[in-house]
Amino acid sequence: MRTVWTICLILFIVIIGFFGDLIWYGVQQGIGQAKIIYRAEEVSDVLSNANTPDSVKLKLNFIQQVRAYAQDSLGLNDSKNYTSFFDQEGKDLMWVVQACPEFSLEAYTWNYGFLGRLPYRGYFDSLRSAKLSKQLWDEGYDVDVSPVQAWSTLGWFRDPILSNMLDEDEGMLARLVIHELT
């Protein structure tokens, strides 16, 4: 039995050694997403709240119409995404870092294990995104750090409507919602 525990400990140390940064990044992302998902309110509750401005109610109803269109006319699955609402109180929630070599359009990519390589890295902490941006800049990359309006948990969780999404006109809002539902 002692041999089994020793092998497990060695495997654990090796996995942390090779994938520790990726695991820590995943934990940070999970915490950021969980805070938002946990604090989100049901759209039906927001719509029935007398204190909700009419402009917010109109956009929330529009998003529900876009969801129905995406399911009925485009054949997308009913994922229950965008059936809850998170008020950002005017603050950005997430920042995406993108980079490429100077004078190049070839994107720098990050390895996300079983998800593959992606040309961006997102953070729920602006200081972490700024730190990575500076590191890449110091390595000679052109870097862009941008706040994002929405993101997808790829069906793992029920993604909420973020209040800053409501700043978009109907055309852009429909595009954003359909994009995130696919």
Where would I find each of the regions flagged by the language model?
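Acidic/His-rich structured neighborhood in mature extracellular/periplasmic domains
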Residues: 65-182
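N-terminal low-structure segments adjacent to metalloprotease catalytic domains
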Residues: 1-91
